[in-house]
């Protein structure tokens, strides 16, 4: 089936697959609702939601640009707009620049601290795709990139980045490494052949164990966060439910089948949503 130019750009941003935007949105909302005691400023909320959409789209574009010479050798990615020739490298870079500018125009309506922090976020978004060629730990860089909205959210709401923001940052970074390792398990065999590095390759036969340890660390630190902020019992019920989803994910990846690993990755959307409900319900109940 022939694809129009507009459809190709839409696919390039993965707007047809919103899971990445959701996984970036949930921790942003965690931070906004915690920083604002459950009632974030509407202007700030809209800016951050739109910023998530623009920056996630920009991240997908620069990722496909970085992978344009190898995606054609992977069955799952061979039909993407860049390797298939529907979009040129120059067009992709121009589109990336437009998305970044749109994001920056949004953040310019925030305070100075938020604007300063945003520059680091842009660097992380650009760096991640290229890390897959130089280190087996690109998921760590993605963890930083997908967590950077957290200190930005606190800065936007309170003009400071307290210790709880950095604890939440670590929690989300560990969670990101866990679920992106699940995602990397899907393409592990292809990645080995074409020289792409990932934690799935680095961890090898210990992949499931390390993912489990990361998930346990996330749960433990969420409990620490709840204790520090004196969150209500509603919050802990949410953490218990999230633990149940982590157990389910471990069951899914036990045989390392591609489809099951991808299903485990997708399941993390429910984890992020549950934690958001737990946080927002708890802080609203207490306010």
From Swiss-Prot:
One record GO biological process: ubiquinone biosynthetic process
Q: Family, per the entry?
A: Belongs to the UbiA prenyltransferase family.
Topological relation to the membrane, as annotated: Multi-pass membrane protein
The protein depicted here goes by the name 4-hydroxybenzoate octaprenyltransferase
Major localisation: membrane
Task: Please give an example of a GO cellular component term from this record.
Answer: plasma membrane
Which InterPro entries would you find in this protein's record? HB_polyprenyltransferase-like (IPR006370), Prenyltransferase (IPR039653), UbiA_prenyltransferase (IPR000537), UbiA_sf (IPR044878)
- Pathway annotation: Cofactor biosynthesis; ubiquinone biosynthesis
Question: What's the cofactor?
Answer: Mg(2+)
Enzyme Commission number(s): 2.5.1.39
Per its UniProt entry, which superkingdom is the organism in?
A: Bacteria
Q: Which reaction does this enzyme catalyse, per its entry?
A: all-trans-octaprenyl diphosphate + 4-hydroxybenzoate = 4-hydroxy-3-(all-trans-octaprenyl)benzoate + diphosphate
TM segments?
19-39, 42-62, 95-115, 136-156, 166-186, 210-230, 233-253, 264-284
Q: Which GO terms describe its molecular function?
A: 4-hydroxybenzoate polyprenyltransferase activity
Keyword Magnesium assigned: yes
């Amino acid at each position: 089936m022939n694809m129009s130019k507009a459809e190709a750009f839409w696919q390039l941003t993965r707007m047809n697959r919103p899971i990445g935007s959701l996984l970036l949105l949930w921790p942003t909302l965690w931070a906004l609702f915690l920083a604002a005691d459950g009632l974030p400023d509407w202007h700030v909320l809209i800016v951050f939601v739109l910023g998530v959409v623009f920056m996630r789209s920009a991240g997908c574009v620069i990722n496909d640009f970085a992978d344009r010479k190898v995606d054609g050798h992977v069955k799952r990615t061979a039909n993407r707009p860049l390797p298939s020739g529907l979009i040129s490298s120059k067009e992709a870079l121009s589109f990336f620049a437009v998305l970044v500018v749109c994001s920056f125009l949004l953040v310019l309506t925030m305070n100075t601290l938020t604007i300063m922090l945003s520059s680091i976020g842009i660097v992380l978004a650009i760096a991640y795709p290229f890390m897959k060629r130089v280190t087996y730990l690109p998921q760590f860089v993605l963890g930083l990139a997908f967590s950077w909205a957290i200190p930005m959210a606190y800065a936007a709401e309170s003009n400071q980045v307290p210790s709880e923001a950095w604890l939440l940052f670590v929690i989300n970074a560990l969670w990101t490494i866990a679920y992106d390792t699940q995602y990397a398990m899907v393409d592990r065999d292809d990645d080995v052949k074409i020289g792409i590095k990932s934690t799935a390759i680095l961890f090898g036969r210990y992949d499931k164990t390390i993912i489990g340890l990361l998930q346990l660390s996330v749960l433990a630190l969420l409990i620490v966060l709840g204790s520090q902020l004196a969150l209500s019992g509603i919050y802990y019920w949410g953490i218990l439910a999230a633990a149940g989803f982590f157990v389910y994910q471990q069951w899914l990846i036990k045989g390392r089948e591609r489809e099951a690993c991808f299903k485990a990755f997708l399941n993390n959307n429910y984890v992020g949503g549950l934690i958001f409900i737990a946080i927002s319900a708890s802080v609203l109940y207490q306010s």
